[in-house]
Swiss-Prot record:
L-homocysteine binds at I434, G435, S436, E487, D602. Belongs to the vitamin-B12 independent methionine synthase family. The active site is at H697. It is an enzyme of class 2 (transferase). 5-methyltetrahydropteroyltri-L-glutamate binds at R17, E18, L19, K20, K117, R518, C519, W564, E608. One of its GO terms (biological process) is methylation. This is 5-methyltetrahydropteroyltriglutamate--homocysteine methyltransferase.
């Protein structure tokens, strides 16, 4: 039986981020809808051709999205929130953009749909909204149009469709509460119609994505799979597709389904292939996701060959990417500045397609020449194991020497708080900001000129110093109590630290989509991490010299740096996090020596690092908390440690939030009207809290009365003596005029509350 290969999806944005540029040009009114549609058409044609040329047997169609593939599915099903609908009920690309962004070149602006993380990745999807009794109909034929495009170009294709149960699982009920699973029978006819249309076009296989099957689903959701797939069977062959984790716990549900094939993620999952092979119906096709779609490392194809060869001829087999290649940059050949040795360890999306082709050929015809080709390809990643760039004996020794004392502050919080009160003598309702101030065109230009060699180090430092001086003066004028230096020198909160730590490398063009038109370029962790010299001390010390008020030192925490980078695969995430923590522990010590008495360690990614299955949460939370404490615990008792977190759900991890033992935690609460504080109240959270009093994602300036009302609400839940006053998040994306006004109102609200207490 001949093995075929396929990818589950391909990056959409284009090698030069053409899609991003076309979207933003269209949104700004600088190009027409037809010009935007043409860019999409060109990108799809190019990506199909590139995959085919790299040796992919079946190219995916339906993985392209103008904003997000879950949003595309919503439109396919005619699921458009009332506030985003066209007057005549039609659906067009502007409908899609109104749901994603809240506005488009046509139609009335309305609040955008909610956005959240796609499983445990750094990609975000638009959350479908459901209401009781809503109607569904085939409303957006993008998938069928793209299938026609690909067939006209002569490609062998496999359409991709987000499965009905995962789609419902990912959505939220709006308005009156009801069980959204009850909508299953209403959406299935649309799926049937789409599959019938694909069958008419001669399509043999459809990839139907049900990643919810890797989760611990409630029984009623698992029970829904059988009738759902009973309704969908018969028109085309269905490849039930899972990714991001194992499926063993749901295997009984899966193997009873009327589908013709199953895709499993063999990279992130830990399913025993022999057991899986034995447990599945004999006639099923088994697709094995062996090439990691979420990282940038070259595969050891020789190892995969040895692992997979026993399965050859046991059943129909396909080889695929573990998940969509959406999460990987496009082409390693674009990287001209990477060191040759390091570059030889990497594979981006196009290289991963070539890996699939090479491995498939070897398994189909395992002759000496093919095996030698596999060995030659795998040699660099094998040589990496002993590279001096990867291993640092000092880091490994230091890690091994960590004791339980290294992760605990000297005194408990109550005693520390007393010494800190004496040192800082802050008023009631102390005011501060989260860290960054507006990143003006001037600041960005300064950094770019320095990076590209147009500005020498001395002039760059002079320029940054001026911006820090301005930030301190602004805060003094506003009357804030604890100041920040404004982070003018930082491009990105993770990239900045990665650039100053050994063990990281950076790409020129390693862009991946985060959401909509937003792309990120994650650093790559290639080896043991250490800090060759102080990173933030010079700027913090300078800022502190300009004022009598305390200035916070600002660090990005170890878990966030790990989660927002491409990690190495040869050691555990725990090991990487603790190496970063040790490097930043030295930074805490140096900041203290420089006279900085308040140090903030941001951990916005702590919650998003959670494994998909609750059974694995405790182990993760244990080492994530330990990494934070290892970073912070070197601080003296009178040094106040702050942390900042921005997400909407604390209930299920309150124990761990408290275990961080930060003296002050600042959180994002304004959009939830302080409801988030319920978690802290119910838990009787013992330390100090700064609930965000205004939403920095909006240019709207909150009134003094509005902020005051929010603070009063907060004081009903948390004793006023433990409350701080601050915005939700950093102010880097805002302009100075609204920043000044909002902070002035915030300070005034705090002053009014203080006066009441006198």
């Amino acid at each position: 039986m001949t093995i075929l290969n396929h990818t589950l999806g391909f990056p959409r944005v284009g090698l030069k981020r053409e899609l991003k540029k076309a979207q933003e040009s269209y949104w700004a009114g600088n190009s027409t809808q037809e010009e935007l549609l043409n860019v999409g058409r060109e990108l799809r044609a190019r990506h199909w051709q590139q995959q085919q040329q790299a040796g992919v047997d079946l190219v995916p169609v339906g993985d392209f999205a103008w904003y997000d593939h879950v949003l595309t599915t919503s439109l396919l099903l005619g699921n458009v929130p009332e506030r985003h609908q066209n007057a005549d009920g039609s659906i067009d690309i502007d409908t899609l953009f109104r749901i994603g962004r809240g506005r488009a070149p046509t139609g009335k602006p309305a609040a955008a749909a909610e956005m959240t993380k796609w499983f445990n990745t750094n990609y975000h999807y638009m959350v479908p909204e459901f209401q009781q009794g809503q109607q569904f109909k085939l409303g957006w034929t993008q998938l069928l149009d793209e299938v026609d495009e690909a067939l006209a170009l002569g490609h062998k294709i496999k359409p991709v469709l987000l499965g009905p149960i995962t789609y419902l699982w990912l959505g939220k009920v709006k308005g009156e509460q009801f069980d959204r699973l009850s909508l299953l029978n209403d959406i299935l006819p649309v799926y049937q119609q789409v599959l019938a249309e694909l069958a008419k076009r001669g399509i043999e296989w459809v990839q139907i994505d049900e990643p919810a099957l890797v989760l611990e689903l409630p029984q009623e959701w698992l029970d829904a799979y059988q009738p759902a797939y009973q309704a969908l069977q018969g028109q085309v062959k269905l490849l039930l597709t899972t990714y991001f984790d194992s499926i063993g716990h749901n295997i009984d549900t899966i193997r009873a389904l009327p589908v013709q094939g199953l895709h499993v993620d063999v990279v992130a999952g830990h399913d025993d292939l022999a057991v899986l092979n034995k447990n599945l119906p004999k006639e099923w096709l088994l697709s094995l996701g062996v090439i990691n779609g979420r990282n940038v490392w070259r595969a050891d194809l020789s190892s995969w060959f040895e692992r997979l060869q026993p399965l050859v001829n046991s059943r129909p087999l396909w080889l695929g990417s573990s998940c969509s290649l959406l999460h990987s940059p496009i082409d390693l050949n674009e990287e001209t500045r990477l060191d040759a040795e390091v570059k030889s360890w990497f594979a981006f999306a196009l290289q991963k397609c070539a890996e699939l082709a090479l491995l498939t050929q070897a398994l189909n015809a395992p002759n000496d020449a093919k095996l030698a080709e596999l060995a030659a390809y795998s040699a660099p990643i094998r040589a990496r194991r002993s590279s001096s760039r990867v291993h640092n004996a000092q880091v490994e020794q230091r890690l091994a020497a960590i004791t339980s004392q290294d992760i605990e502050r000297q005194l408990p919080y109550e005693a520390r708080a007393e010494t800190q009160r004496k040192r800082f003598n802050l008023p009631a309702w102390p005011t501060t900001t989260i860290g960054s101030f507006p990143q003006t065109t001037e600041i960005r230009g300064l950094r770019l000129d320095f990076k590209q060699g147009r500005l020498d180090g001395k002039n760059y430092r002079t320029g940054i110093s001026e911006h820090i001086k301005q930030a301190i003066a602004e805060q003094e004028r506003l009357g804030l109590d604890v100041l920040v230096h404004g982070e003018a020198e930082r491009n990105d909160m993770v990239e900045y630290f990665g650039e100053h730590l050994d063990g990281f490398v950076f790409t020129q063009n390693g862009w991946v989509q985060s959401y909509g038109s937003r792309c990120v370029k994650p650093p790559v962790i290639i080896g043991d991490i250490s800090r060759p010299e102080a990173i933030t001390v010079e700027w913090a010390k300078y800022a502190q010299s300009l004022t009598e008020k305390p200035v916070k030192g600002m660090l990005t925490g170890p878990v966030t740096i790990l989660c927002w980078s491409f990690p190495r695969e040869d050691v555990s995430r725990e090991t990487i996090a603790k190496q970063i923590a040790l490097a930043l522990r030295d930074e805490v010590e140096d900041l203290e020596k420089a006279g900085i008495g308040i140090i903030q360690i941001d951990e916005p990614a702590l919650r998003e690092g959670l494994p998909l299955r609750r059974a694995d949460w405790q182990a993760y939370l244990q080492w994530a908390v330990d990494a934070f404490k290892l970073n912070a615990a070197v601080a003296q008792n009178d040094t106040q440690i702050h942390t900042h977190m921005c997400y909407c759900e604390f209930n299920d991890i309150m124990d761990s939030i408290a275990a961080l033992d930060a003296d002050v935690i600042t959180i994002e609460t304004s959009r939830s009207d302080m409801e988030l504080l319920e978690s802290f109240e119910d838990f009787a959270y013992p330390n100090e809290i700064g609930p965000g009093v205004y939403d920095i994602h909006s240019p709207n300036v909150p009134s003094v009365e509005w902020i005051e009302a929010l603070l009063r609400k907060a004081a009903q839940r948390i004793p006023a003596e433990r409350l701080w006053v601050n915005p939700d998040c950093g102010l880097k994306t805002r302009g100075w005029p609204e920043t000044r006004q909002a902070l002035a109102n915030m300070v005034l609200a705090a002053q009014r509350l203080r006066e009441e207490q006198i």
